[in-house]
Swiss-Prot record:
<keyword id="KW-0968">Cytoplasmic vesicle</keyword>
<dbReference type="GO" id="GO:0001786">
    <property type="term" value="F:phosphatidylserine binding"/>
</dbReference>
<dbReference type="InterPro" id="IPR033917">
    <property type="entry name" value="ML_PG-PI_TP"/>
</dbReference>
<dbReference type="GO" id="GO:0032366">
    <property type="term" value="P:intracellular sterol transport"/>
</dbReference>
<dbReference type="InterPro" id="IPR039670">
    <property type="entry name" value="NPC2-like"/>
</dbReference>
<feature type="propeptide">
    <location>
        <begin position="22"/>
        <end position="37"/>
    </location>
</feature>
<dbReference type="GO" id="GO:0000328">
    <property type="term" value="C:fungal-type vacuole lumen"/>
</dbReference>
<keyword id="KW-0445">Lipid transport</keyword>
<dbReference type="InterPro" id="IPR014756">
    <property type="entry name" value="Ig_E-set"/>
</dbReference>
<keyword id="KW-0813">Transport</keyword>
<comment type="subunit">
    <text>Monomer.</text>
</comment>
<dbReference type="Pfam" id="PF02221">
    <property type="entry name" value="E1_DerP2_DerF2"/>
</dbReference>
<keyword id="KW-0732">Signal</keyword>
<protein>
    <recommendedName>
        <fullName>Phosphatidylglycerol/phosphatidylinositol transfer protein</fullName>
    </recommendedName>
</protein>
<keyword id="KW-0333">Golgi apparatus</keyword>
<comment type="similarity">
    <text>Belongs to the NPC2 family.</text>
</comment>
<keyword id="KW-0963">Cytoplasm</keyword>
Length: 175
């Protein structure tokens, strides 16, 4: 039960929040509503930034997925481009979380440099523009439902590289 409560609280915290100043209007001010909305990652994808990316080490220009949304049994083509503002060295890591509804399937810390070999890159990564492409064969048997993925990435000094999330990626059962 505690597990489900924690997962629900996390989802509530990650969801876009909409609060109006009028709901806190003690002094009858005419302030306009405060809107805290997630910022989408440019391109054909379901990705959003977890928070304001302006101070991140990675400036993502665009991420394209094909097909979007991903389909079971199909090859997912990923093309991404961006600019690294600093060198990324060994010791960088990713905090990865994958959920199926409210159920956490994966919660792990992964070595970023070990993961980069999957997209034919390796550490150290120098500052500057970069583009990566990757083909991923998705299994035919993905349980139908809504999935949420979040990847929070840090350099070896704990500085924020980027944080991305994909909410409610839905796989439908065969009809």
């Amino acid at each position: 039960m505690k597990f489900l409560s924690t997962a629900a609280a996390l989802l509530v915290c990650l969801a876009p929040v909409s609060t109006t100043a009028r709901s806190l209007d003690f002094f009858k001010s005419s302030q306009s509503p405060i809107q805290a909305q997630a910022k989408s990652v440019p391109g054909n994808n379901p990705l959003e930034y977890c928070n304001d990316p302006s101070g991140d080490i990675l400036d993502i220009k665009q991420v394209d997925l094909s097909p979007n949304p991903p389909l079971p049994g199909k090859t997912l083509a990923i093309t991404a481009s961006g600019t690294l503002r600093e060198k990324i060295e060994d010791g960088a890591y990713v905090l990865l979380e994958v959920k199926y509804g409210l159920i956490t399937l994966v919660r792990q810390t992964a070595d970023l440099c070990e993961q980069l070999v999957n997209v034919e890159l390796k550490c150290p990564l120098g500052p500057g523009d970069m583009t990566l492409t990757k083909q991923v064969d998705l299994p035919k048997q993905i349980p139908p439902g809504k999935y949420t993925v979040q990847a929070d990435v840090f350099n070896s000094d704990g500085e924020h590289i980027t944080c991305l999330k994909a909410l409610n990626i839905e796989f439908k059962g065969p009809f």
